[in-house]
């Protein structure tokens, strides 16, 4: 399917589920409603961080990424629950099915938010009625609240959906940008993170209005092409299309995990890298693809984040090769400070069908032999379990039966993609 068309009169919705994980848990167990609830990585040990929380908890000062001990100090009666990703995934599928019944132009951007373009549908006659009906259908069918932004482009729709929560419906017209958006601080603008905001502040840009009116040359000097792009958004200009196929495109496959506590334990960190590589390999195989660049992400206890990558001569797709490069990068660039999050990704992706056309005979024969062995191993693993075959290196290590920890948002998008 082609993306939605470009014209000046499009009707774009941005649908954002309110406190999604917490809302799903409350729908599953209504006795939790009206109580301060937080989803956290490791509530038993009180060393994890808050993944998300209900509005009741937020009212007491509980915030995402806050350590559990700090959240409990602010809100002693806080109810803590581990995440149930299967439950969240199932709820998300049902929500996006409802959106797809209105228009084929639906673009998910994460498990709990997405865009839809209703311009060329019968629902375009009264967008507010359509938004209200959709909101009520999700609430009555799944007991999950959402906010909806309605605007002529994706950026304004996203900004609109953030204006009223929970259960808000907001229309934001381009002519209202100066009145409604320009007084807001740049930190509140979608697409601007903490570091970008600091850079903008350094050249006296404090509000969205300041950004909209700044000399574009200065912005490009500071932020490159992104400077002009952000200025366009600040002026309400965004020509991106709602593209249902965008979820099918991929240039990288990655997995990341926040640790239950800040760690300097090399054994623990290496074990996590193993698990992340396991997950990357599984998803790479599912796509029948390979990549030429391995990247690691390290986020420290103070939230400072670094990414380091290594470009390879040949495409790789298996655990051993990805792990070798990931460990090498980690050992070279970790400064031994406590680590809060690790990530591994394989980038510069290409399908094996396309890669095959680039291989010479000798390379192909070597890969073919390796592939035959790996197919046999995969079949045995599938039939008898992951413990049937272990490498000589790992034969004395304990094998874990649990699913590797994953970057859940990317897994969700994989689910949404058509086979």
From Swiss-Prot:
Region Disordered, residue ranges: 388-419
Segments traversing the membrane: none
Location in the cell: Cytoplasm
GO terms of molecular function: damaged DNA binding; DNA-directed DNA polymerase activity; magnesium ion binding
Record-level GO cellular component terms: cytosol
EC number(s) per entry: 2.7.7.7
UniProt cross-references to HAMAP family, sorted A to Z: DNApol_IV
Similarity section: Belongs to the DNA polymerase type-Y family.
Name of protein: DNA polymerase IV
């Amino acid at each position: 399917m082609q993306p939605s068309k470009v014209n000046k009169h499009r009707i774009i919705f941005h649908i954002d589920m309110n406190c999604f994980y917490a809302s799903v848990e409350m729908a599953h167990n209504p006795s939790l409603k009206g109580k301060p609830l937080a989803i956290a990585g490791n509530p038993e040990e009180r060393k994890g961080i808050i993944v998300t929380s209900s509005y009741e908890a937020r009212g007491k000062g509980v915030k995402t990424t806050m350590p559990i001990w700090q959240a409990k100090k602010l809100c002693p009666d806080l109810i803590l629950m581990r995440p149930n990703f299967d439950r969240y995934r199932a709820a998300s599928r049902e929500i996006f099915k409802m959106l797809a019944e209105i228009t084929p132009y639906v673009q998910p951007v994460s498990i709990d938010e997405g865009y839809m373009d209703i311009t060329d549908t019968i629902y375009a006659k009264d967008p507010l009625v359509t938004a209200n009906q959709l909101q009520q259908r999700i609430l009555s069918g799944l007991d999950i609240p959402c906010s909806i932004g309605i605007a002529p482009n994706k950026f304004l729709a996203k900004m609109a959906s953030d204006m009223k929560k929970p259960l808000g419906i907001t229309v934001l017209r381009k002519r209202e940008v100066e009145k409604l958006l320009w007084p807001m601080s740049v930190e509140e603008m979608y697409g601007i993170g903490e570091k970008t905001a600091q850079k903008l502040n350094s050249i006296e840009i404090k509000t969205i209005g300041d950004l909209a009116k700044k000399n574009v040359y200065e912005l490009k000097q500071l932020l490159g092409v992104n400077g002009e792009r952000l200025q366009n958004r600040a002026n309400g200009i965004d020509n991106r299309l709602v593209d249902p196929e965008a979820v099918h495109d991929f240039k990288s496959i990655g997995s990341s995990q926040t640790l239950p506590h800040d760690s300097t334990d090399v054994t623990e960190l290496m074990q996590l890298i193993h698990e992340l590589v396991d997950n990357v390999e599984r998803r790479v195989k599912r796509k029948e693809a390979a990549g030429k660049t391995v990247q690691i992400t390290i986020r420290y206890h103070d939230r400072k984040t670094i990414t380091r990558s290594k470009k390879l001569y040949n495409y790789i797709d298996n655990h051993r090769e990805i792990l070798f490069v990931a460990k090498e990068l980690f050992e070279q660039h970790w400064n031994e400070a406590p680590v809060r999050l690790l990530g591994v990704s394989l980038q510069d992706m290409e399908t094996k069908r396309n890669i095959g056309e680039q291989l010479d005979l000798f390379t192909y024969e070597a890969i073919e032999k390796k592939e035959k062995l790996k197919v046999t191993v995969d079949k045995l693993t599938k039939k008898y379990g992951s413990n049937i075959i272990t490498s000589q290196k790992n034969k004395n290590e304990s094998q874990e039966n649990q699913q590797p920890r994953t970057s859940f948002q990317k897994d969700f998008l994989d689910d949404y993609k058509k086979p």
